[in-house]
């Protein structure tokens, strides 16, 4: 069920334009994917990434980023994609197991994706995209790669023999797969077949494909067109 302009239970914020390298990777993809997995209707409120945010938006998201979520049923406003995934997961056991250990495992891996893996992926993207060619980035890269490889090796050991992190597919896999996509093509995943196979399982799901297509369809061709 793709995003719809009609009123829906959840409203998610996103951008109506980003540079080409960011298309398909903006973090509103995460709650979109979760909604698609369980057929939960959602609508999008698109912001112009090339313009200053409306001042009122900082009350929803203190840094003016996306996504933020408004749950029309409860009236709750939530920011940070991990918190949003947890909120959506609470609505349906297909995304968050109801048995205590399954729930604890899924939540642990949700936090692990964003606290133990994403910081390295984010920094790697920073030095290779935004600081490419700068001396400090070249000096930082070897130690960053070494540390990232250690994290990925431990992740591969943890995933080996499992289909999904918490037994069943869950919000933990949405979190981890979207983080791993950020370093796909760097060679770091390709050197670890267990992680590549895990990522391919995740992004081959129809719900991911629907969420990705919906996000890409929302982008205007240029900042001027998004104004």
Q: Regions from the language model: what does each represent?
A:
Residues 52-55, 201, 219-221:
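Short secondary-structure boundary/hinge segments and terminal tails
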Residues 48, 171, 215-216:
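Short, solvent-exposed turn/loop segments enriched in Gly/Ser/Thr/Pro and often Arg
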Residues 1-139:
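GST-like domain detector, emphasizing the conserved glutathione-binding G-site
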Residues 213-227:
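Terminal-tail/helix-coil boundary detector
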